[in-house]
Regions:
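Helix-turn-helix
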Residues: 2-41
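Short, charged helix-capping/linker segments at alpha-helix termini
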Residues: 10-11, 127-135
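Short helix-capping/turn signature of helix-turn-helix
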Residues: 32, 78, 92-99
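Hydrophobic alpha-helical connector segments
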Residues: 41, 55-86, 135-142, 184
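Short, basic, alpha-helical segments at the C-terminal edge of helix-turn-helix-like DNA-binding modules
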Residues: 44-50
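Amphipathic alpha-helical packing segments from all-alpha helical-bundle domains
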Residues: 52, 82-91, 101-126, 137, ...
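Secondary-structure edge/capping motif, primarily at the C-terminal ends of alpha-helices
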Residues: 61, 94-98, 153-157
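C-terminal peripheral helix-coil segments that are non-catalytic and often amphipathic
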Residues: 112-124, 145, 151-188
């Protein structure tokens, strides 16, 4: 991941990985087989880590939809997921996904699962409370804000904090569902 973060996908080579790790290129080729296989494996690792993170957050959250949605938001900004290095690598893969079916499939499957979960929670909340937006629009808005804050975390000022991001998304959520009382804001 370090090479992708520092050099991007196109400049990441098995030779550069070997140099960075301090082993022979032959050893890297033996274990990784090809750059294509390495990149696919890296993306699957990131994808699995992210998916396991948000699924675990749901499992640990109280069962009501509002708490579960807040848990998904917090999970999107945990340090092991939301850090400059990993976001940089995610953006590199997202940028290539349109021309690489493997990347599109891996990214797309997880994105769809996350989106479906956010939408289902928004639909449940909408059915039980006053909502200023339809569930589809609310889900799209919350996800778009998370993605935008990830981009801000990567490209914005170095003073940007996870707690600020979580608070911002919670405030959007609270403005969409005004009759829900906000719980305490996480301090990640």
């Amino acid at each position: 991941m370090d090479c992708i973060d520092k050099l991007g996908l196109s400049q990441t080579t098995l030779a550069r990985i070997a140099e960075r790790v301090g082993i022979s290129q032959g050893n890297v080729v033996f274990h990784l087989h090809s750059k294509k296989a390495l990149l696919a494996q890296t993306l699957r690792h990131l994808n699995d880590e992210y998916r396991c993170n948000w699924i675990a957050a749901l499992a640990a959250a109280p069962p009501d939809a509002h708490s579960q949605l807040r848990a998904l938001i917090e999970a999107s900004f945990t340090p092991k997921i939301c850090n400059r290095r990993k976001i940089s690598v995610w953006f590199a893969f997202w940028g290539e996904s349109r021309s690489r079916p493997t990347y599109m499939r891996v990214c797309g499957d997880n994105d769809k699962a996350f989106s479906d979960q956010v939408l289902a929670l928004c639909q449940t909340i909408e059915a039980r409370s006053t909502a200023r937006l339809k569930a589809e629009t609310a889900a799209l808005s919350l996800e778009g804000m998370i993605d935008g804050l990830w981009q801000n975390f990567l490209l914005g000022s170095s003073g940007f904090k996870r707690a600020q991001a979580i608070k911002a998304v919670f405030e959007l959520m609270d403005s969409i569902y005004p009759d829900r009382k906000p719980e305490s804001v996480a301090t990640i």
